[in-house]
C-alpha cells in the first residue's frame, strides 16, 4: 500500500486514491484463471522504488518506456502458449498508469485501443488498485463471456511486470 506524501512533489500529483481486492475461490464464478507470467528485471529497479517510510522514487520516462516494451512481450508470450491472437481477446484490463501507455501497448499488439478498458481519466493512476478497479467496472459494464479470453497486465516497483489470461465460464 502506498500513501502519498505532500513533499513528494514529483510524483504526488500522478496518483489518485483507490483500493481493490480480488476474491479467488475453487468454486465456479464469472471466470477462471488459465495461466500467468511474471517477470522481474532488477537492472531497472532504481527507476521505480517504493521503500518503507520513504518517498516513492520514479524515473517516469524510463518506466513508461520499459513498460511499453515489456508488457506487450509478456502478453504475447502468454497468448502464444494457447494459440490465441491478440485481436481475438475479448478485453485487456491493464494497470491504469496513463492513457499513453495503454495506447502504446494496444499499438504494439495490433489491437484497437477500444479493447483496452480505460478509466484513467475518471480516477487517475490509483497505483496497485488501478487494475482491480478497472476490472470491477469492466465486469459491471460488459462482463465475461463463456470461453472468451480476457487478459490482465500490470507492472510495478522493482521492476516487475506480468500478465494473466482468464476465460469466462
Where are these regions (language model features)?
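Condensing-enzyme catalytic core mediating Claisen C-C bond formation in acyl metabolism
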Residues: 6-69, 73, 155, 168-169
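A broadly tuned preference for mixed-charge, low-complexity surface segments
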Residues: 40-51, 74-78, 82, 143-160
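Short, surface-exposed connector motifs at secondary-structure boundaries
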Residues: 83-88
Amino acid at each position: 500500500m502506498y500513501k502519498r506524501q505532500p513533499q513528494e512533489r514529483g510524483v504526488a500529483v500522478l496518483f489518485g486514491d483507490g483500493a481493490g481486492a480480488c476474491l479467488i475461490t475453487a468454486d465456479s464464478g464469472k471466470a477462471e484463471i488459465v495461466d500467468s507470467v511474471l517477470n522481474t528485471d532488477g537492472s531497472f529497479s532504481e527507476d521505480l522504488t517504493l521503500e518503507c517510510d520513504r518517498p516513492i522514487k520514479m524515473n517516469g520516462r524510463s518506466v513508461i518506456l520499459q513498460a511499453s516494451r515489456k508488457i506487450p512481450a509478456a502478453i504475447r508470450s502468454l497468448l502464444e502458449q494457447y494459440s490465441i491472437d491478440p485481436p481475438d481477446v475479448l478485453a485487456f484490463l491493464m494497470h491504469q498508469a496513463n492513457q499513453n501507455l495503454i495506447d502504446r501497448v494496444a499499438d504494439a499488439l495490433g489491437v484497437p485501443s477500444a479493447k483496452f478498458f480505460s478509466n484513467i481519466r475518471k480516477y487517475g493512476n490509483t497505483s496497485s488498485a488501478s487494475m482491480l478497479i478497472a476490472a470491477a467496472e469492466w465486469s459491471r459494464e460488459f462482463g465475461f463471456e463463456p470461453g472468451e479470453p480476457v487478459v490482465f497486465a500490470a507492472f510495478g516497483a522493482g521492476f516487475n511486470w506480468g500478465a494473466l489470461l482468464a476465460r469466462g465460464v
